Each structure stands twice: as structure tokens, then as C-alpha cells.
């Protein structure tokens, strides 16, 4: 039976709409983790498809400066993995949450304990950017009988056979990495990016979402045309932190029709 995240995103895709997933850093709020529910409900009310929730880490190798600074602010507010898990247990939302974490915080907490403790929460997906596919067995056995999907990240420089290997049996969605480098580095796209996205889209049997560097209306239109939707992180994190209006951008993303 498909996991909830797969079903919900497939339903959006079947309705002819683009999937939109914003990223937020847990604890990057003037209230710390006490402000997490407020941010989630703000985004939920705008109609987003799912929300990616980052766990702060002191050595975030895949994060650009905006998200790295958000993580440092969160850590300064006292955010810990344990405190985040306890907070997530109290949050009621109808949309799926996807945890983005480096492996070290997960390892320190205990993978099995982490998965068990999230069992009755809205968390339906898990992204671990520094966990190689060959080491997915460190996590996958603990997710097998749960409703949490392990999300594969696929670089668009990866050959088609390797792409197939990475996404075989995957649930939730495929995270297509649009740029070589860290998050937030917009505009530095390969000339053949659209072709590679279209190729990945053809071999995947779950939604393909494009992330890393997606930040403009033009990006939304471009990547919705060749994948099933987009993930936006740095633009959202910066706007929320600085109190900039972001509602119109999100509404445009949510309303995108295929």
C-alpha cells in the first residue's frame, strides 16, 4: 500500500496542478520551536502541498548561507532534535511534513527511536542529504512498516541507469537537485537541465520535484513544465526571518496549473 505522502502528492499531480513544497528551519523563529506550529499553519492556510522541516546542524554541507544562518539562529534558540520531536507530537496539520536532516543528528538520537517517536505525528517523509544510497540500509529497515518515506536525492549529472537504481522502490517523491552546489544558489543551471529533468521524469513512477536554487516566478514556470513541482527553501526562509511578504509568491506556486 502506498505511503500517505505518495498518495497525497499523486492526487495533486492527477488534478493537473503543480506540487509546491516550501522548506522551513525548525526553531528559526523569535519564539524558537514554540513558533513552529504558527509557521506550519501559515503555510498550510496558503495551500502548500507539503512542508519540509529542517533540523539544524552545525556542519550543514549541502546548505547555502541563508539556510546555514537559519540553522545557527535555531541552535542559538536552543533547538535540539529531542525538543523538535516533542514539538512535532503536539502539532496538528492536514498536510504531510517531511524532515530534512543530516545523518549525524539522526545517529545521535538513534534512528529506530527517531522513527518510533515520530509514528503518531504528521511527519510522512525523511530526507538525509549526506546519506549515500549505498548506506540507505542504515535507515530503511526502520521505515519499512511505517508511513514515513525515505526520499531519494538525484543529481541531474547522474546517468540514467544510476537514476533508476536510486529511485527503485522509492516512495513519496524524487528530489531532483537542479544545481551542482549548495542550496539557494539560483540561476546557475546546466544548459541541458530541462532535458535531464524530462529524462528523470520518464523513469520515475512517483512525483519528481525540483529543488536547490528555485527562487523566482520564472523558475516556478520552468520547472513545473518539466517536473511535477518545486521545492523552495532559501527564498522562504529569508522572507520569514526578515518579515518580508511571501504570500503572493506561494499563492502563485500553489495555483500553478499543468
From Swiss-Prot:
One of its GO terms (cellular component) is cytosol. Keywords: Amino-acid biosynthesis, Aromatic amino acid biosynthesis, Lyase, Tryptophan biosynthesis. It catalyses: (1S,2R)-1-C-(indol-3-yl)glycerol 3-phosphate + L-serine = D-glyceraldehyde 3-phosphate + L-tryptophan + H2O. InterPro entries: Aldolase_TIM, RibuloseP-bd_barrel, Trp_synthase_alpha_AS, Trp_synthase_suA. PROSITE patterns: TRP_SYNTHASE_ALPHA. The keyword Protein transport does not apply. The active site is at 52 (proton acceptor), 63 (proton acceptor). One of its GO terms (molecular function) is tryptophan synthase activity. Its EC number is 4.2.1.20. Pathway: Amino-acid biosynthesis; L-tryptophan biosynthesis; L-tryptophan from chorismate: step 5/5. Pfam families: Trp_syntA. Tetramer of two alpha and two beta chains. The alpha subunit is responsible for the aldol cleavage of indoleglycerol phosphate to indole and glyceraldehyde 3-phosphate. Belongs to the TrpA family. This is Tryptophan synthase alpha chain. It comes from Streptococcus pneumoniae (strain P1031).
Amino acid at each position: 500500500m502506498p505511503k500517505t505522502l505518495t498518495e497525497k502528492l499523486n492526487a495533486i499531480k492527477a488534478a493537473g496542478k503543480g506540487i509546491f513544497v516550501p522548506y522551513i528551519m525548525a526553531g528559526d523563529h523569535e519564539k524558537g520551536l514554540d513558533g513552529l506550529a504558527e509557521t506550519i499553519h501559515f503555510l498550510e492556510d496558503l495551500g502548500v502541498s507539503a512542508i519540509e522541516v529542517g533540523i539544524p546542524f552545525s556542519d550543514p554541507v549541502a546548505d547555502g548561507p541563508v539556510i546555514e544562518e537559519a540553522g545557527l539562529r535555531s541552535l542559538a534558540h536552543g533547538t535540539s532534535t529531542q525538543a523538535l520531536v516533542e514539538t512535532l507530537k503536539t502539532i496538528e496539520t492536514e498536510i504531510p511534513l517531511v524532515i530534512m536532516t543530516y545523518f549525524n543528528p539522526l545517529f545521535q538520537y538513534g534512528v529506530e527511536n527517531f522513527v518510533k517517536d515520530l509514528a503518531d505525528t504528521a511527519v510522512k517523509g525523511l530526507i538525509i542529504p549526506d546519506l549515500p544510497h549505498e548506506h540507505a540500509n542504515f535507515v530503511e529497515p526502520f521505515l519499512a512498516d511505517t508511513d514515513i518515506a525515505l526520499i531519494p536525492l538525484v543529481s541531474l549529472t547522474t546517468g540514467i541507469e544510476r537514476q533508476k537504481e536510486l529511485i527503485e522502490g522509492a516512495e513519496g517523491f524524487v528530489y531532483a537537485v537542479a544545481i551542482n552546489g549548495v542550496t539557494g544558489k539560483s540561476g546557475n543551471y546546466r544548459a541541458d537541465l530541462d532535458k535531464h529533468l524530462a529524462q528523470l521524469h520518464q523513469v520515475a513512477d512517483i512525483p519528481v520535484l525540483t529543488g536547490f536554487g528555485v527562487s523566482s516566478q520564472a523558475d516556478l514556470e520552468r520547472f513545473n513544465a518539466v517536473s511535477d513541482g518545486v521545492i523552495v527553501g532559501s527564498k522562504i526562509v529569508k522572507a520569514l526571518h526578515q518579515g518580508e511578504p511571501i504570500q503572493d509568491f506561494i499563492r502563485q506556486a500553489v495555483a500553478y496549473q499543468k
